[in-house]
């Protein structure tokens, strides 16, 4: 996938100072750090195991290192990357945003660029070679991108984009309806 290749291009082009910021842990989580919770909380920890890979276990140290703190992005700010690295970072962002309907994607792409790359963070966990277990995330004020490929040969990608304010399981009707909807509708 273009997104995975761009992630490798970034991490493998970083100098030592950049690497010390970008690599959050030498072990990748088995799956998303945010798991499959309906709304991302203030702090999220990856699961100890993935039911599909019970042999792949994380220690408490691994989980702590790979945790997501919503208000404190881990990794390196996009503004600390060189022009080529920034282009790869924006490619990742754009590819994930292109999963949205075009008007939504274009608005979010503009928003990322207008806010600036100092508000876009790239974090990596795991090995930095293809065909190995690895994970990266792109953390912005508005959304989170996660890509994990932790099966031993690195050949099974899971990826997600999550909106911090309008995420999985969000109840748009309840948030926007002036009165609670009754359990039983009159006359029905």
Functional labels for PLM-detected ranges:
Residues 1-188:
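A cross-kingdom marker for long, charged
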């Amino acid at each position: 996938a273009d997104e995975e290749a761009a992630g490798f291009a970034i991490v493998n082009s970083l100098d030592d100072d950049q690497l010390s910021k970008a690599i959050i842990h030498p072990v990748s989580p088995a799956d998303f750090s945010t798991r499959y919770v309906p709304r991302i909380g203030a702090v999220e920890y990856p699961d100890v195991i993935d039911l599909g890979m019970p042999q792949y276990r994380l220690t408490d140290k691994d989980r702590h290192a790979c945790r997501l703190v919503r208000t404190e992005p881990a990794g390196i700010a996009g503004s600390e990357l060189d022009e080529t690295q920034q282009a790869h970072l924006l490619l990742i962002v754009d590819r994930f945003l292109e999963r949205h309907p075009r008007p939504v994607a274009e608005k979010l792409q503009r928003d990322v660029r207008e806010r600036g790359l100092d508000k876009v963070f790239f974090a990596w966990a795991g090995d930095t070679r293809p065909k190995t277990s690895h994970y990266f995330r792109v953390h912005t004020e508005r959304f989170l991108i996660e890509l994990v490929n932790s099966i031993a040969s690195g050949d099974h990608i899971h990826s997600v984009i999550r909106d911090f304010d309008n995420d999985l399981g969000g109840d748009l009707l309840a948030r926007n309806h002036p009165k609670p909807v009754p359990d039983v509708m009159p006359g029905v």
